[in-house]
Structures are given as structure tokens and as C-alpha cells.
């Protein structure tokens, strides 16, 4: 049975869990130096005592607007920087401070950051970036979100996170993947290399699904094309490009599934003296600010990233609905100078 939470302190959690106050603090904040088994035991005690609920009650009682937590995979990635800009804009109009957490694309760091934000007394959390198709990660994320919402917190996500059951802004990744592949196929390309991130990311699975649909209309499958999974970064794009070119030197196009990877692809092609688009066409996905200023300017799929950030926080500021709300962020094909009709 839960204790009455008035006046509940960290020392109460520590005593009940049989640990020091310092250890309890580290466990609840997600800090290093505590084993996962011990941290989970302390969190279970805190949940049973209602300690998190007490933290939020004190925050609300202070009269201040609870802050906003924003979880991103990589703050240096222009995709997430644009999203953060939208979140900050809306937060500013509501007088709320934003705390940004960077996960370094590590799923377990993402779970720890969620926990840290809850214990930092934010009232809203926006999770930006792809959901993960990993049941263990999904289960841990869901547990943190449910605990937060059970004490009045609000959560919204950007991307497909079907296991969380929260309000979401979902980019049209399937449609975008289809559009960019159809563009290359329409230019006569059939020997297309694909530079992809991990298929354990829902974003990647969706973009590849769209590409697959376009290929199917031309009698091809993903298995017919060289596909390299690498980090969803510029360096990952370089790695993918090198492998594609080394193993399949006859490719006439490389389809990168985000703009960061596309920049890496362009870099490797430049190093090897491969003309773009004369020898190899290159495409990206997202349309980050720099995409239109590259040489050659990058053909890509535009997503309204800043608006996605705005919409996510706007959803989270609304009272919780009986069923999760979902908004779709539409895509637009941006044809620029990095693609051309296949030679011969």
C-alpha cells in the first residue's frame, strides 16, 4: 500500500530501499555508478511510495509553470536542431523553460534521460526522433512514460512510437521514401545503392517501406539493390558510400535516407573523382537547411521539421484525450541538381 505522500522525502525512499540517500538520488536521476538492478529496485520503491507524484505536487504548488523536457538523438544533427527550434518557439510563448537532453542515439541513454527529466520536475516531455523496434527498449520507454503520466505529466512524440500510446506528430516517411525512389526510377536508374540507418529504427523501416513500394512497381525489390546499414550520420554516409562503391562500382545512383548521410556520400564521391550527377546521382531525406546550398544542391524529401516541433509541444500542452491524438507532417519532393537522367 502507498504511504501518504505529504512531506515525503528522498530519505524515505532511501530507507525503504535500504540504500544511502546518495545512492537513491543517483538511481532516481539516472546517474552513473548504480547498477541497473539496484536502480530499478529504488525506482520501484519510489513508485510504491508515490515519491514522483510528490515531486510534481511540490512543483505545481510553487506556482511556476512546469518546464518542458525535450529528448533528441543528436542535438548537432540539423534535423533535431530544427525540431528544437520549433519546441523552443512554442515554449517561449507559454513562458516555459526547455531542458534539452541528448541521447547520442543510444536507446538506453534515452530511457535514462526520460527518467532524469521526470526527476527534474518537468511537466511535459517531448520525445523527438524515431521509435525503436526493439521490445526491451519499448518496454522500458513505456514504463517511464506511464509512470510520468500517472502523476499528471504530459508526453508527446515526434515519429512513430506505437507502443507508447501518446499524442504524436508523425512524418510521412513512407510516402517520402516512395517519392524519392520514384524520382530516381523515373530518371532511368536501376543500379541504385542505398545508404541506410539501422532498420531497428521505425523511421528507417518506414522510409525503406516507401522505397520498397516504389521498387515493386518496377519489378524490383530491396534485395536486388546494394543496401548498407550504418550510423544515421555524416560519417555513416561515408562508410556506406565506400562500401557501395567498393562492392558495386557500377551503381548509377545512391539513395541516402537522411541528409546527413547524403553529405557523407557526396564527400566520398568527391574524394574519388566521381562526378555528381554525371556519373552518380545522389539523394537525401529531410531537407535540412544546408541541403539547398551544397554543390551540387541536394535532391531530397522535405519534412517540416520546425513545425513538427511546434505541433508536438502544442499537443502536449493540451489536456490528455481519451485516445492519443495523431498529426501527420506531410512530405514534399525537392528536385535539385544532384540527380540527373541515367547515362546511356
Region spans (language model):
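Hinge/beta->alpha junction and helix N-cap segments in small-molecule ligand-binding domains
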Residues: 73-82, 100-109, 131-136, 160, ...
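N-terminal helix-turn-helix DNA-binding module of bacterial transcription factors
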Residues: 1-64, 208, 343
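Short acidic capping loops at alpha-helix termini that bridge into adjacent secondary structure
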Residues: 190-191, 222-226, 276-281
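Alpha-helical recognition/docking segments in bacterial nutrient-uptake
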Residues: 1-5, 63, 67-182, 186
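Flexible loop/turn connectors
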Residues: 242-243, 247-344
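Short acidic/polar active-site loop segments enriched in Thr and Asp
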Residues: 20, 123, 189-191, 252
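Short helix-capping segments at alpha-helix termini
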Residues: 93-94, 151, 215-222, 246-250, ...
